Amino acid sequence: MKKKKLLSFLLAGALSVSALSIPAVAIAKANEATKQTYVPTISSKENTMKIDLLSGQILKFASNYSKDYADKVIKDDLQIDRFAPTPAKLTWEAEDGALYYTLKVSKNPDLSDAQIFLTFTNEQSIEDLLMGTKYYYQVVAQFENKTVKSQIFSFETSYLPRTIEVEGISNTRDAGGYYTEDKTHRIRQGMVYRGGKIEDGTEAGKAKLLNHYGIKTDLDLRAEATASPLGPTVNFVNVSGPYYAGTGDSGTGINSLADSSKGPWKGTYRDALLEEIRTFTNPENYPIYVHCSLGRDRTGTIIFLINALCGVGEKDLFMDYETSFFSRLGRADNQTASNMVNTPFQGLYTYVRKYAPKKTLAEATEMFMLDIGITQDEIDSIRSILLEEV
């Protein structure tokens, strides 16, 4: 009875625990366990081994993406968050009488570095999985006088934007997970997060950024604050970042940085963008949370430049940007996705593309960065930190 009360307490606090949190007796019994032929199954919309971590309008948008598709999916003017991630739900079948189950979930076939969940039922919801990633799992059923262990099974998450839920903060997601155009690499996940202003976050939300996502750098592109809402333990980079590729003499776009005839703020915005980009050259700065106010314009510009530099293709770059319109802040100024995608964001893409129209977008972005003063060593550093082979 005491053991059941202890497990109930653990489950009430948090289902995800480390191996050290499991009672020693259970570990000893699990080590002696023999394989048994009961079959865990995955419950998903299509009842397949592919799990969608999005649902509703955002799932329809991301699964069938084409430019300015958001306005065709969203049929109202409500400024609400529509892209909360959907947990994966694992279920399994076992003989009656189990006291509790231990579920191990890992990205590794041998279940090393596994997340461990304890549950009294034959199902478990798992939050915050990575996009486009294969996972392995095993269920261990603990009975009064025996331990029954399943074989190792697997499932894969769909290649859809990895949105995250941070209480109080809108427009939050992982900027990684996307493949390069040649499919040889992808952007590491859990390295760069993007979203809206942090000060909107509850204490629980800010604690989640610090403790769950491990944020080490708050890259604030508004130049309005003197300290991070996340506290003194994070590296605070605060600049007034340029956005898009402005027209006329606005001087606010990245096209003004390399052309002395554009706008009075050329030097200021150039220095700001250099500091933004150089934040990504230091491995000690990661994970980074990048934001402006809405998490769409200044944030969208720097995320475009970093991911384009690393080789992400046009479709994924546009989809990541347009995902903002499924958030409360992304629509806070009543702009439509169609207008913003086809005018300022398309202008940003076109401007960078012109640096090397016959080469890849990654090469064109590299040439732009070299033009404004980023060095080749700094470019190489960003790529080495953010890219992983596939």
Give the label of every model feature segment.
Residues 27-289, 302-390:
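Cys-dependent protein tyrosine phosphatase-like superfamily
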Residues 294, 298-299:
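Ser/Thr-glycine-rich phosphate-binding loops at phosphate-binding pockets of nucleotides
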Residues 1-30:
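Gram-positive Sec-dependent secretion signals
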